[in-house]
Swiss-Prot record:
It comes from the Archaea. NCBIfam families: guaA_Cterm (TIGR00884), PRK00074.1 (NF000848). Its EC number is 6.3.5.2. It holds the Pfam family GMP_synt_C. Heterodimer composed of a glutamine amidotransferase subunit (A) and a GMP-binding subunit (B). One of its GO terms (cellular component) is cytosol. Pathway: Purine metabolism; GMP biosynthesis; GMP from XMP (L-Gln route): step 1/1. One of its GO terms (molecular function) is CCA tRNA nucleotidyltransferase activity. It comes from Methanopyrus kandleri (strain AV19 / DSM 6324 / JCM 9639 / NBRC 100938). Coiled coil: none annotated. The keyword Endoplasmic reticulum does not apply. This is GMP synthase [glutamine-hydrolyzing] subunit B.
Amino acid sequence: MFDPKKFVEEAIEELRREIGDRKAIIAVSGGVDSTTAAVLTHRAIGSHLVCVFVDHGFMRKGEPERIRELLEEELGLNLRFVEAAEEFFEALRGVTDPEEKRKIIGEKFIEVFERIAEEEEAEVLVQGTIAPDIIESERGIKSHHNVGGLPEKLNLDVVEPLRDLYKDEVREVARYLGIPDEIVERMPFPGPGLAVRVLGEVTPEKVEIVREANAIVEEEVEKAVEEGKMSKPWQAFAALLDCKATGVKGDERDYGWVIAVRIVESIDAMIADVPEVPWEVLRNIQDRITSEVPEVTRVLFDITPKPPATIEFE
């Protein structure tokens, strides 16, 4: 049986051995993986850790501001906030292949971190990589920005304190470390963010559409859970398909984007199933998206489990 107390004690000792008196940086997204890795490392080396939050332009609605508040004020981490949206959008210009997008985002992340690391005179990069990330990357299912995107000649030593843990174990460790429930229970969110929920080329306009649609999905699912209409899913989100469809708004023909809604249940992200979501919930999601996001004319519901599909679309 997994013992979070024992894991934390051993991980802190190992981090101290691996990092020593060197300065380290870690990418924090506000998710449970990176936050747990950050708090764990902070316990081990204190002020020698610099937490770097990169706003790549692909975060959920209102997320950068809230994450900054949680990490700085509530957890007391030493945080550097980097605005880099223009860099990421430019790097992804014209790119449509999902693997290429993930690789580019990973490389850009490392490029930004190396720049910050040089300014901070850091020698170690701590990552919140967990077991499913490594397994999917090794099997060639999909690259993860904190696994497959690493350049061969990385100028920093890489430390991954959570690499042997699955998501449910990470949450146990997070609770033991006193991390707020808002982070512990936060739905998993991919490192590349909304960029992998935009099929085809990633543009600021497309990201804004999926950001608004995604917020609606999360709000409606959270409301349904609170009202006892459904159990809390592993993930619930919106993806923007790389196609348009004809619609009718008012008395006029419209030609707009198609949103796919994805709701899944899982324990460790290795396999996932699709729950029977109440029809009322799906209708509410559709009504709000097509009325509040004018660029969208059609909303679909994805019923494919993992396998054969992956949880994210890209």
